[in-house]
């Protein structure tokens, strides 16, 4: 979503959302639509050895009691390359591993996601993604592949297309034989500053309209999503409100669902604008969840 500005994207990244490598625009040097075929051979799915530049350690608390500790390593492009839990090996989650291929301008052209089950370090590859860009580095196409166990080929799982602003306008998922399983389209409208003002999503008789407002700095202030269906006269409205500090960092996000259940998330940062604390307060939950984040340099 092009209208949600860099500070908001950085918060989500620091809050452990895996990047696709397209959060900033860089001139594209080598990506072409024809580089995204329907199938890939096993030899075409590479696992580059991306080096960790820094680590984020996050601590999850419920009602002030530590319930989980996570380690996440990032490369020097700020993309996550490893995510694992710490603690009792029998209760540990799968370790997630990510490998990236970059063009000369730093755009991600391929990403591979694999898993390892502790204490084993053997990797099982689950997903492979390919990306291509407009000339200015804005993401244009994204194809996700999964491995066919019979043929050993990597086949298209889904495909996304984006407009020149970087907003998703088409999504298609595929069956194992290559036929279309699901399709959705989105029409996007922009304000005079180029911010995404409205997007209308359609698929199989259902629709969803999202409208956005911004402050003078281009930070998103409100997002209102209305969902409806041809089979019903009812519609459902979801609203999210955002607040920022003087440096443009997102400090509060409040979500309200159609039943007036509200969840607020507050964020705190260090002097270099890195996320160090997240506090989730929900009217529909008896559990108070917080996260604390620490960073350490690994290389470079």
Residue ranges and their predicted role:
Residues 1-9:
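Bacterial N-terminal signal peptides that target proteins for export
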Residues 18-21:
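C-terminal motif of bacterial Sec signal peptides marking the signal peptidase cleavage site
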Residues 23-25:
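Bacterial signal peptide processing site
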